[in-house]
Each structure stands twice: as C-alpha cells, then as structure tokens.
Swiss-Prot record:
Residues annotated for tRNA binding in this entry: 14, 64, 66, 112
Biological process according to GO: protein quality control for misfolded or incompletely synthesized proteins; rescue of stalled ribosome
Subcellular location: Cytoplasm
Phylogenetic lineage: Bacteria, Pseudomonadati, Pseudomonadota, Alphaproteobacteria, Hyphomicrobiales
Protein name: Peptidyl-tRNA hydrolase
Native source organism of the sequence: Nitrobacter hamburgensis (strain DSM 10229 / NCIMB 13809 / X14)
Entries under NCBIfam families matching the protein: pth
Length: 204
C-alpha cells in the first residue's frame, strides 16, 4: 500500500497557485485512474483506488502548507505505513518549469510543507519534485509560489500534470528512473523541455 500526498493550500483562493501543483497532480491521478470520490479524512481530503494492482490512498492536506505533516501523520498511522510508503508531490523552485525529479530523503530546500512532514514522520519518504522555476531573487520566492501560474504557463502545467498522473503507477513500485524518463521524454515530445545533452534523459 502507498500513500500519495499532494501538497497545496485549501480553498479556491489558492487553487491556481504554483504552490498547489501537488494538489493538481493527485486530483488528476484520481480522475484518470478511477479512484473513489474524495471525502473528508485525516485533516484533509482522501481518495482510495489502485495503481498497478497496488492499493493507493491519495491525500490533500487541508491544514495549509506549513502544517501538512499533521495530516500525513494521521493517515500514515491509520494505515500503519512507514515513511518509505509515502510519496509526496510538491512544487520545486530549484528546478526549471516542466522538469521533474524524484528523490528519497535529503534536504527540504526551504519548503515548509516538506519541513512539516519530515518533522512528523521522518525524512526518508519519496519526493516528486515538480519544477515551477525560480523568480530570480530570494525576496520574490514567497510571492512567486503563492501566485497563480501565468496564462502562458498553463499549457506546460496541464501537460505535466497529465503526464505525471499517467505514469504514477511506476512510483508504486519505486521505478523512479523509469518514471522520470517517461515524464521527461513526454514533455520533450510536447516541446516543453529542451533536448538534453547526450546521455541526459531526465535522470537524477
């Protein structure tokens, strides 16, 4: 069993924010793969289904970003899951727009949602880092992630959310490199990421 957590802030005010791309991904996973309707659970909204014949629970914490760990801990305890069973989808300013990287453990790069989760369940969970780009200077980061994606960005955002959801089953069995490669090649084919130098196919 796996717990897939999408990070974001609840409410229509934040719906289109860069910070909410994690919510967008788990919403699309639920839609694409026929998960059960969302219902209020674990200080958030949860939906159950299966990917690659493995039971998966999707979770959108309603605690606001900085307290995401409370909801994740509640769900993990209920299902008796370890941090290794948890996959977190989140915005990543240190990656260019439309890029995706997967890693287990490591630093939190100033992300308050990850900080909260690590404080509650430990650090060795899988993170799917969804690139939203950096505004250029540290002082603009807060406004950058709490603003909506620009109209010009929406095509790649919709494509990325779709491709990540399509290939989400690979994350259930920790086929992280295969997941990264499939997402990278699909986004490249759609013209949203440039062709890499020889030998770089979207790996870590």
């Amino acid at each position: 069993m796996r717990l897939f957590v999408g990070l974001g802030n609840p409410g229509t005010k934040y719906q289109g924010n860069r910070h909410n791309i994690g919510f967008m991904v788990v919403d699309e996973i639920a839609r694409r793969h026929g998960f059960a309707p969302w219902r209020r659970r674990f200080q958030g909204e949860a939906s159950e289904g299966a990917l690659d014949q493995e039971r998966v629970v999707l979770l959108k914490p309603a605690t606001y970003m900085n307290e995401s760990g409370n909801a994740v801990q509640d769900a993990a305890r209920f299902f008796k899951l370890t941090e290794g069973d948890v996959v977190v989808f989140h915005d990543e300013i240190e990656l260019p727009p439309a890029k995706v990287r997967v890693k287990v453990g490591g630093g939190i790069a100033g992300h308050n949602g990850l900080r909260s989760i690590s404080a509650h369940i430990g650090n060795e969970y899988r993170r799917v880092r969804l690139g939203v780009g950096h505004p250029g200077v540290k002082e603009r980061v807060h406004a950058h992630v709490l603003n909506d994606f620009a109209k010009s960005e929406r095509p790649w955002v919709e494509a990325l959310v779709d491709v990540v959801a399509e290939n989400a089953a690979l994350l259930v069995t920790a086929r992280d490199s295969a997941f990264q490669n499939k997402v990278h090649l699909a986004m490249q084919a759609k013209g949203f990421v440039e062709k890499d130098a020889k030998g770089d196919n979207g790996g870590k």
